[in-house]
């Protein structure tokens, strides 16, 4: 699939959908904020360069008591040292990216690129280097020393050494799998709470839409990153239309596949061209999943870590158990959220837009399915999956959630029955019984075990 390809029947003169500069894109860009910091440092240097007081000014002796030659030597030394430090920083960053991709999940690479500390260190080092060479260019043996520039380089040089030491400690901490799991969990939890409204019943909404309708094919291929509802609402109200979007953030679409279904208020024909143009503006399609509106991405990252941990090349079931523990916390939070489709009405109260949404079964399947299949012969991980289901069972708020939890539990027990020796199978079945106790509301019996890696009494 080629990202950004268009349908054969499209007019080549029609403008492509605009490129959106979003906060997430800027945050995930490893070069943008360091470049801004470097540019600001150069501008500040140029503004300070004309300040060249003579030796009679006492404060200049406090900032820089020596002459032009010594100042030039300082700037040369700082520039050389900072480039060495920048090389070390880039090397450590590349090692971190390689380790995250090979040992944990390729979907974690974006988290390293959007790390604020890494961008700050690169910005300080790059800014210090540019200030040094800019100041060196402005040195003149026939003129007084630009003391403010030299003082700035002196301060930035000290700051560069400090941030390099802090960065090494930060990288060492970031490469720990527990830190990666914590960051993925916290980011997913923040997106989850921004995306889904609280619902004490956890019931999904149903919306009565007329039969039929006009399918709207997509004009671009890629992955849905965000959905901007406002331009769609404006177009739908103006033209008297009702739309149901068939895709959602995280979905992969191809040219010609249906992305929406549209009805006219009066039952007449739908202006397909105008609808497609508005959809192209509203659907941000890229080449990778982003966390802005994609709650499932964080769960996918944690599931990837669990699956990778139980692979033959790593063979670390304890890490897999811990990853399922983080997933359990997210799944418990999802139980009291309004999942599924959402409806949006115009100022007159007329239903105009219905968006698609994932249900609780989707999230449970996404977490439990891959881990259960890859851990079919590892009792530690299968017990952790059942422990996750027990936590979800203890907080389930409706019968549909209980049914899904019971279905997942039975699949784990069926897997264990065909793969485990008797002693391991009995341990897993004991946890399966505790899932049933939690579903029945007997929490004392459900949580009185001593087994597992993350809970004991």
Predicted features along the sequence, with ranges:
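Short secondary-structure boundary segments
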Residues: 28-39, 109, 126-130, 134-138, ...
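Generic detector of multi-pass transmembrane helix bundles and their immediately adjacent loops
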Residues: 152-164
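A residue-level detector for conformationally permissive "hinge/kink" positions
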Residues: 33, 73-79, 83, 214, ...
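Short gly/ser-rich anion-binding loops that grip negatively charged ligand groups
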Residues: 95, 99, 154, 292, ...
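Membrane-anchoring hydrophobic segments
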Residues: 1-76
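Transmembrane alpha-helix detector for multi-pass membrane proteins
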Residues: 37-56, 66-140, 161, 165-168, ...
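Membrane-interface segments at loop-to-transmembrane junctions
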Residues: 19-35, 63-80, 105-123, 144-153, ...
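Short basic (Lys/Arg) and small-residue
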Residues: 2-20, 144, 148-150, 166-244, ...
């Amino acid at each position: 699939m080629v990202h950004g390809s268009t349908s054969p029947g499209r007019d080549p003169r029609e403008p492509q959908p605009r490129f959106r500069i979003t906060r997430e894109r800027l945050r995930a860009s490893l070069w943008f904020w360091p470049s801004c910091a470097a540019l600001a440092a150069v501008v500040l240097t140029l503004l300070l360069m004309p300040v060249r007081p003579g030796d009679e000014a006492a404060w200049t002796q406090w900032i820089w008591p020596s002459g032009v030659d010594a100042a030039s030597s300082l700037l040369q030394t700082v520039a050389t040292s900072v480039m060495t430090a920048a090389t070390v920083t880039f090397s450590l960053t590349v090692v971190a990216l390689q380790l995250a991709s090979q040992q944990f999940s390729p979907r974690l690479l974006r988290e390293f690129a959007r790390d604020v500390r890494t961008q700050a260190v690169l910005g300080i080092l790059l800014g210090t280097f540019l200030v040094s060479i800019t100041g060196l260019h402005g040195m003149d043996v026939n003129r007084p020393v630009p003391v403010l520039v030299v003082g700035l380089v002196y301060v930035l040089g000290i700051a560069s050494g400090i941030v390099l030491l802090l960065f090494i400690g930060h990288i060492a901490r970031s490469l720990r799998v527990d830190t990666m799991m914590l960051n993925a969990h916290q980011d997913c939890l923040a997106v989850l709470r921004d995306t889904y409204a609280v619902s004490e019943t956890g019931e999904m909404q149903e919306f009565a839409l007329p039969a039929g309708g006009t399918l709207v094919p997509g004009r671009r291929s890629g992955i849905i990153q965000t959905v901007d509802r406002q331009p769609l609402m404006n177009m739908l109200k103006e033209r008297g239309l009702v739309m149901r979007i068939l895709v959602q953030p995280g979905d992969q679409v191809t040219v010609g596949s249906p992305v929406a279904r549209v009805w006219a208020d009066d039952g007449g024909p739908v202006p397909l061209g105008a609808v497609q143009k508005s959809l192209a503006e509203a659907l941000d399609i890229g080449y990778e999943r982003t966390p802005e509106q994609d709650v499932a991405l964080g769960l996918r990252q944690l599931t990837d870590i669990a699956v990778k941990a139980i692979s033959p090349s790593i063979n670390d079931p304890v890490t897999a158990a811990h990853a399922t523990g983080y997933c359990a916390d997210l799944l418990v939070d999802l139980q009291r959220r309004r999942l599924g489709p959402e409806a949006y009405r115009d100022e007159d109260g007329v239903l105009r837009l219905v968006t698609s949404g994932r249900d609780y079964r989707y999230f449970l399947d996404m977490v439990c399915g891959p881990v259960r299949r890859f851990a079919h012969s590892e009792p530690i991980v299968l017990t952790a999956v059942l422990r996750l289901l027990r936590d979800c069972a203890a907080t389930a708020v409706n019968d549909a959630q209980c049914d899904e939890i019971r279905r997942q539990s039975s699949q784990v027990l069926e897997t264990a029955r065909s793969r485990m020796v008797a002693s391991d199978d009995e341990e897993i079945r004991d946890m399966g019984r505790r899932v049933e106790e939690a579903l029945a509301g007997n929490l004392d019996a459900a949580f009185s075990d001593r087994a597992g890696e993350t809970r004991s009494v």
